[in-house]
């Protein structure tokens, strides 16, 4: 079995966790010195190959495959684009709230939704649809959230003024009807 390919395979499948020289040595049944030679060879091979986007890096004593720095912008764009991933209903709900009422704090979002929105906000920030835009001058200095320019691109508009109008009075009336029905059912 090819020693170089074995090291390359193991670095590939280890992903972001990476492998120490000792782990690589144990898995390939090669000496640490032989593994180091294979890693050095692969580093040079990737470095000199302009057709390859890969490199091998060492972080905290672990080796792992990574992409070359010059491809960072492409990866950043890929990470921003949901592609085959779709936003959950709760993420769409929070995104809508922020789009129409921005800027606002997580607590304001939680109050409107009736549930904690921390996880959803993290997801929306990871997709670069929402960002922190400041802090409220109040105890705890809570962060204010607003949509990003990427959000506008994502939904295909140029400015927030292009968002469809919503009739809040209709939603309030519907909520009141549901609340009244719930009370009537409890009293029966």
Curated annotation (Swiss-Prot):
Keywords: Cell cycle, Cell division, Chromosome partition, Cytoplasm. Its main location: cytoplasm. GO terms for cellular component: cytoplasm. InterPro entries: ScpB_csome_segregation, WH-like_DNA-bd_sf, WH_DNA-bd_sf. SUPFAM superfamilies: Winged helix' DNA-binding domain. It is found in: Cytoplasm. The keyword Cell division applies. The keyword Cell cycle applies. GO terms for biological process: cell division; chromosome separation; DNA replication. Pfam families: SMC_ScpB. Homodimer. Homodimerization may be required to stabilize the binding of ScpA to the Smc head domains. Component of a cohesin-like complex composed of ScpA, ScpB and the Smc homodimer, in which ScpA and ScpB bind to the head domain of Smc. The presence of the three proteins is required for the association of the complex with DNA. HAMAP family: ScpB. Participates in chromosomal partition during cell division. May act via the formation of a condensin-like complex containing Smc and ScpA that pull DNA away from mid-cell into both cell halves. Belongs to the ScpB family. This is Segregation and condensation protein B. It comes from Lactococcus lactis subsp. lactis (strain IL1403) (Streptococcus lactis). The gene is scpB.
